[in-house]
């Protein structure tokens, strides 16, 4: 048992080192108050939302499938029937989802809303080898059944939740009725088609790009301030931003607050974090992206601290000072040039007059 545990940890560590791709599709079917159903399919690859399908039962003909990120244009160019095929597949799933929603609403009852979710995911290495897969179905925000680990056995939900416990017989019956053939189909999809498309997508997505990091201080007041650190233009989207104070992470009561990870149109991500700190202390922002790490020093000086003799940074004053400095240097150079020209002219004139006087004396001597 211990050997298997150590082997599992080793495999996970190796995947961390060599890299792993994650392809996930999420399906959400919702019945509204008018008994109209909408189905939305979202495709996510390595944390990037790359595909969306949407349809409403009131207008099935308007179903649409779209790539939602720049590199999907290259996928569509390489596979011209890709979006049409995804739309046709979404239309087929819509009919199945509508039937499942009706059955679940009758069996489990209408609660706050009628929402059926379905998720499947495959994890692959950089060279395209299958690592792990997952299949799961949920109702109103709770998991009903899952296929994971070795992908051979479906498991049920957490029956500690009251309404799930009340419907345990129905849910267990649904799981028991899943045939081995259906399980094999799902397993083959995760190990086959899902893995193959993960390899295809990896060939079109942007290469690994490390972030541009900017850090500083804002909202400075008395002896408190906020240190911020923002990372721009990185891919993939997994990043860790921390603040270091005297070699240690900031205390737990000053845990950094991070804004949501946001994608950009070029396929990269950006994220910013900030933390409340004390003035007159030095901090460091440490950003880790994969095996790449950078540290940005952040120094905070109290606005009331005049003992240092430093003038507070003021952009307008600095600009005026820089302009005056440049003007002074140019004026000094001009004066030096004029002085040099005057000395040169004076020396030349003096030499000319001396030669003229010598020539006059020589002429006078000869005439005598």
Curated annotation (Swiss-Prot):
InterPro entries: Ig-like_dom_sf, Ig-like_fold, Ig_C1-set, MHC_class-I_related, MHC_I-like_Ag-recog, MHC_I-like_Ag-recog_sf, MHC_I/II-like_Ag-recog. The chain crosses the membrane at residues 321-342. This is Glycoprotein UL18. Residues 19-114 are annotated as: Alpha-1-like. Glycans are attached at residues 56, 66, 74, 95, 123, 127, 150, 167, 177, 193, 240, 282, 291. It is a single-pass membrane protein. PROSITE patterns: IG_MHC. Residues 1-18 form the signal peptide. One of its GO terms (cellular component) is host cell membrane. Residues 209-303 are annotated as: Alpha-3-like. It comes from Human cytomegalovirus (strain AD169). Residues 115-208 are annotated as: Alpha-2-like.
